[in-house]
Amino acid sequence: FLEGIVEKKTGKLRLSLSLSKKGKTARVNSLETPRLSQYIGKLNVILFSPEDLSLVKGSPAVRRRFIDMEFGQIDAVYLYELTRYRTILRDRNVYLKQLQTKQSTDRVYLEVLTEQLAKSGAKIILKRLEFLKELENYAKILHADITQQKENLTFKYKCTASIDDLEMNQGAIEIRLKETFETIVDKEIFQGTTLIGPHRDDVSFKVNGRNVQTYGSQGQQRTTALAVKLAEIDLMRAKTGEYPVLLLDDVLSELDGERQTHLLKAIQDKVQTFLTTPGLNDIARQLIKQPRLFRINAGKIEVRPETIDRKSTRL
């Protein structure tokens, strides 16, 4: 069980989340929310952990999850459409399996599901393109600052249905999705699964025109990941009018001194930050000028003095 009070411009909110064998229960001001999707966005949070450094070199699923998690916090329409898309996708995959195993031979229902999926998918793709363009604008500035103006960062949305030649509007994307589904329907029935759509799309990051995932050094990959994560902070503030809460989960030990400095510069005196670390060696002095220290020992949380013994590396 976790509970806290969030102070926003619109007032205070008491948020709680409990986990039991029956599932998760979320409450806002002691009132249970019927769906967890209605809870998301009440407190905007950005998590930065060592795993996020694999945002660039990880699998497409990692980058899709990043988009859905971060964008879903600030756009309720996107979150709703994403939930709807997943429901239709699940139904379509079930029916494709039935066609594959000859449990059904009627393709009319498949056409209905395909039309619904294309319409919902087009909305998601358009929203993602808009989100990534805004995020790119912030990330470019941060990335150029970190690299001392030597490198230029750009994003590229990689759609499984080619849309590069289209005008970016929902209708055009929807038509292209339908056309692509028509050309691969037999292959989808043979494999028993949906082969194209937002659930299979990807994002690539390019530095000076070269794919940093394929051709970038480890330093370039980490700089790109850092710029993208820091850009989230500015984008969330622009969209919501408030800074998010930042969670740094043992990530500073993974960054060199220069990247730590840029991280601190981006959050100093602006963002409420919770940082976890096994010791203090990897934390820059300027980050902990006025800290509140907590030590977790055997599952218990102890409040520590707000002064740090620099001779010791232990909390």
At which residue positions do the language-model features occur?
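A short, compositionally biased
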Residues: F1-L2, S18-G23, P198-V203, I288-Q290
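Nucleotide-state sensing region of NTPase/ATPase domains
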Residues: F1-V62, I67-Y78, Y138-I141, I173, ...
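A conserved P-loop NTPase coupling/switch region
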Residues: Q38-K42, P50-E115, K119, Q290, ...
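Conserved beta-strand scaffold positions in the cores of enzyme catalytic domains, especially
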Residues: V45-L47, T273, L293-R295
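Hydrophobic positions in the central parallel beta-sheet of the AAA+
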Residues: F48, P244-L247, L275
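Conserved NTPase motor "head" modules and their coupling/switch loops across ABC/AAA+ ATPases, GTPases
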Residues: S104-V245, E254-E258, H262-K270, N281-I288, ...
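Walker B catalytic acidic pair
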Residues: D249-V251
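Structural recognition of the conserved hydrophobic beta-strand(s) that form the central parallel beta-sheet
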Residues: Q272-P278
